[in-house]
Amino acid sequence: MEKLTITRPDDWHLHLRDGAALKAVLPHTVRQFARAIVMPNLKPPVRSVADAAAYRERILAAIPAGGQFEPLMTLYLTDNTNPEEIIAAKASQFVKAVKYYPAGATTNSDFGVTDIHRCDAVLAAMEQVDLPLLLHGEVTDSNIDIFDREKVFIEKYLIPLREKFPRLRVVLEHITTSDAVQFVLSANNIAATITPQHLLFSRNALFKGGICPHFYCLPILKREEHRLSLLHAATSGNPKFFLGTDSAPHARNSKESLCGCAGCYSALHAMELYAEAFESVNSLDKLEAFASFYGPDFYQLPRNTAQITLMKNPWRIPAELPFPESGLVPLRAGEEITWQMV
């Protein structure tokens, strides 16, 4: 296949940052996607409907001239979130979900939940008004091996959560293991997003020729057997699995440092990366549903009507992109990629 035209996709897990960083990265997403679920982990985080409304206006103001893009907002769940805020979020129409970060799990997660059991009243309100919960599904116990933190989270927290709130719609975000795939398949009212890096790379990519900080993200890349399980899930045609890049921009000097930030930047070339992954298992015919149908169906939103086209036209990913401070290094910077969005 040399050409692929599909319904315009959406990104169901995206970091846009704020200020000058927002203005630097937003054009990449606007070019590829019609909508995106925007993560709330700013400094300070987006904790209220008022915060979300203000952030949404800043995003809309940064859309390039002629661009068509709808930011779908989220609230940052904390120990102090109250049920009244959930009711207001649902009524707002522009807040589409609430994000759970375990405190300290990833970038700007210091305000996260210290004990999910403290959130029972809020989760009950979310179940009642049908507002989805988005989970960064890792435990933060330093005694748990970093490669096992998703599996342990499912066993320790997610299984009891499903039993307590069976009608709550849940997205287990950026899944990385066969354990997560099997859990999502077995549970009702639960879906999962999958990133391009977790479809394309195993943990070997982190250490190819030395430490490779631009492949470091959380949850961390896993064994090859887990990558293959994710690839099978993404290309299976099961509507529980859909696109979420988790594209996370960090300045080069924040990645290439003694204690580098977690996150891969893929918004520039996300659809090309996904196309490469799907083509690797002869499943390009499954890409449209994964990228364009299953996400809006889960969120009970209309599917897009516009289209995009990808062509077999090899090109080289830039070594660096403009970004505040010290530039932004995209995933697989400097390498050739087969597909190109036209």
From Swiss-Prot:
Sites where the protein binds Zn(2+) 1: H13, H15, K99, D246
Sample GO molecular function, one term: zinc ion binding
Pfam annotation, one family: Amidohydro_1
Cofactor needs: Zn(2+)
Catalytic activity, reaction form: (S)-dihydroorotate + H2O = N-carbamoyl-L-aspartate + H(+)
Modified residues (N6-carboxylysine): K99
SUPFAM superfamilies in alphabetical order: Metallo-dependent hydrolases (SSF51556)
Signal peptide extent: none
Cofactor note: Binds 2 Zn(2+) ions per subunit.
Pathway in which this enzyme or protein is active: Pyrimidine metabolism; UMP biosynthesis via de novo pathway; (S)-dihydroorotate from bicarbonate: step 3/3
Family matches, as CDD domains: DHOase
Keywords: Hydrolase, Metal-binding, Pyrimidine biosynthesis, Zinc
Active site positions, chain numbering: D246
Amino-acid positions noted as binding substrate in the UniProt annotation, renumbered to this chain: H15, L16, R17, N41, H136, L218, H250, A262
Enzyme class at the top of the EC tree: hydrolase
Family membership: Belongs to the metallo-dependent hydrolases superfamily. DHOase family. Class II DHOase subfamily.
Function field: Catalyzes the reversible cyclization of carbamoyl aspartate to dihydroorotate.
Subunit field text: Homodimer.
Protein name (record): Dihydroorotase
Source species of the chain: Synechocystis sp. (strain ATCC 27184 / PCC 6803 / Kazusa)
